[in-house]
Amino acid sequence: GEIAVTVDSDSAITENAIRALVAPFQRPEVGAVAGNIRVSNCDEGFIPKIMEAAFGFGFEMIRCAQSFIGSVLCTPGALSAYRLSAIRPLLDEWVNQTFMGRPSGIGEDRAITSMILRERWRVEYQSSAEAYTKMPVNYRTLCKMLIRWTRSDVRENLVMLGVVLRRFEPFNYELVSFQLGMIFL
């Protein structure tokens, strides 16, 4: 199948990142794969160091657990891959997405992931596919970034609530409980 890879303009990938990122697509049920995002400017102060720790938890713990059941909730723009047959039918909806009747211009990575999951594709995390990206070094820029991410998370968590409740068999309460916990973490 055909695969599309996204890399943010301010990210740098490791030598084997693409090879590692596309490996899960050998399984036909995989619709998207999230890469492992690291902080490139940890030497520039306290904030990047804290963000590296937060990314470590978010990727190595949270996304790894989500990947176990094929339900990673965000394929980051910094490094992700998509099966074209999974995203082609979603492109118009994704480009023209709205929330509560208004155009939505943030959180495109969470939105496309939600749509892929809604269509019952697996979304996985590949820890060996690494990209390095710069983080803010001052609180003002950090707060703007985190507010933007949080707005997107709230919107997509509401969208995903319906997806999660429809995705799993009614008798599999453990998986439903786990996934709901991951959404609101």
What name fits each language-model region?
Residues 169-185:
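Alpha-helical bilayer-embedded segments of polytopic membrane proteins, i.e.
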Residues 1-164, 168:
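Non-transmembrane catalytic domains and loops of membrane-associated enzymes and transporters
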